[in-house]
């Protein structure tokens, strides 16, 4: 009876709102070699880029991933070239020597800005590839071909 009362009392109360967390879904894809697929559903702006980056980093570390495909097709990217350079530097400083490959799957309208990100990260030691073609991204991330360092 006490349990019923407790439920009834708590049923009408609302929990305090949580701070907005980036919606990052992760799945380990069991190919040879395996990779971590992350799907991001958030608007990426100057204000949200650090929390989004931290959420992605947490998933990579939690899964011990060496290859990561980040699907940004359900996100909107509203970053300046300067912001993209900042993200590239953060990515390299966190994952140079850790990630073997990083693929970004983006909407066609976001491809131009992400193509700036690709060489910025790759030149800092994290092989990166940006595309709007899902098959191309999956092929590249799972490829066994050794990349030049």
Can you say where each PLM-predicted feature lies in the sequence?
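Amphipathic, Lys/Arg-enriched alpha-helical "gate/interface" segment within cytosolic domains
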Residues: 2-149
């Amino acid at each position: 009876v006490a349990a019923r009362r407790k439920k009834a009392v708590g049923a009408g109360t609302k929990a305090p709102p949580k701070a907005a967390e980036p919606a990052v879904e992760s799945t380990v894809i069991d190919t040879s070699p395996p990779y971590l697929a992350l799907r991001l559903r958030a608007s990426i702006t100057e204000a949200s880029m650090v929390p989004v980056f931290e959420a992605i980093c947490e998933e990579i570390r939690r899964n011990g991933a060496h290859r990561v495909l980040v699907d940004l097709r359900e996100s909107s990217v509203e970053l300046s070239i300067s912001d993209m350079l900042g993200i590239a530097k953060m990515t390299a400083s966190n994952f140079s020597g850790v990630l073997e490959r990083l693929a970004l799957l983006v909407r066609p309208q976001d491809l131009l800005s992400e193509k700036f990100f690709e060489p910025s990260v790759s030149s800092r030691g994290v092989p990166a590839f940006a595309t709007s073609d899902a098959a191309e991204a999956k092929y590249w991330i799972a490829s066994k071909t050794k990349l030049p360092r």
